[in-house]
Amino acid sequence: MPSTAPALALRHRLLYAAGSLGVALSYQAFSAYIQFLYIDVLGVRAVWIGVVWAVYGVWNAVNDPLSGYWSDRTRTRWGRRVPWMVGSLVPLVITFYLLWFPFGGGARPAWSEVSLLFYFLLIVLLFDFCWTVYVMNWTALFPEMTSDESQRAGLSAGREVFSIFGLLVGVALPPVLAGADWSGRGGMALLLSAVTFVSLVLGLLGSRERPEFAAEPSPPFRQSVRLALRNRDFLFFLGANLMIQYVFLGLSAAIPFYAKYVLNIQGPTTLFGLTLNADLQNSVLLAAAFLAALPAMGLWWALARRFGAYRALRFACLTGAATAVYFFFPSTFQAGLIGTALFGLSLAGLLMLTNPLVADITDEDELQTGARREGMFFGMNGLIIRFAFVIQGILTAIVFTVTGYVNPSAGVLFPQQPDSALFGLRLLTGGFTALALVAAFIFLGGYRLHGARAQRVRTEAAALQARKREAL
């Protein structure tokens, strides 16, 4: 039976989806370049940045589920989610800017390594808290915006289209705007912060809350966590999504190093008769993945409609693992470009096919508890996937240390790397990516909420929500 909820207006769908551009831009630029900036440009040792990344992951273990729980239990005249989004938006944008351009430090802050390290730690934690509060509440609205399966699929696809553009901006513009020595990153940070602000405001304007979703109070915090962790399907989903998020983070963080040293992008080259400088090559290399992902969205959407999001996601894991192995072989920009474009075809499926599974999980949970607990589920999901930062940071620190990676020094922008370090960069880019996606495929094998069972859950949840709406 179709959903009895009011249809979601096109303007709300477009505005809500537009928020994905700023979400993806800020996250992608941060994950792709912030470690490169502090290690390779500002000279902080990789092992210390790895420690900060581990602390950052533990911090997420606290703020993600708490943010979700607070949101689930919030009751105001403006709703549960929107007040949190309003309060976190401006601090999010300010801390995003300060990540790139240390306050009072100028383009080349004359700070000690210890000062930069503690500044980095403080701003990362503040930025992450604000980002988590906004994005968790914005994401938690996804199942609430519509209960209709077709509209959910369309809304998810729309979000990911905007997300692709955000990812493109986040990976392509920073090296172009900042320059080879990153001395222009102040202007870069200002522009990216402005685009992020506008996009998140649009996402806020498109957000729509349904009063029946707040009709029943959520259980206390400990009980909420316990219920979530007893959900077998959710646990298998968390394992798979952790691996998928590691892939996004690991590739984003490794590609700048891989491009500079493995592909030897240190000067101009020619592509289709055009001369590209090193900065533009870096941008094109990363942009190729997302440009390939855009047309592939239609293919993955068709596969999801035909076979279900669950089966399509498992297939995306396998194709992604197969193409990731290719990263072991290129040694030139042109060959690397083929690899990122091929991986982009699978990237589209990995990006768009996880949220529909969480929506089904929250629908089934409502049937069991009577309460809508998107905040807790997305918060717990945020907690677990943030451990991808810990995994990525630790692996990067270990690989760089063990393989003998050489940091640039004064007057030496392109130090000669030993063969062991080059292999380590190939391992970070291709090997760990392939292994993580195989692990995600295995985890999804334990997820049972798909097919006829998922359709039955959606139908029963829609009927329950209709009864709640009539009782208001």
Predicted regions and their residues:
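Membrane-embedded alpha-helical bundles of multi-pass transporters/translocases
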Residues: 2-472
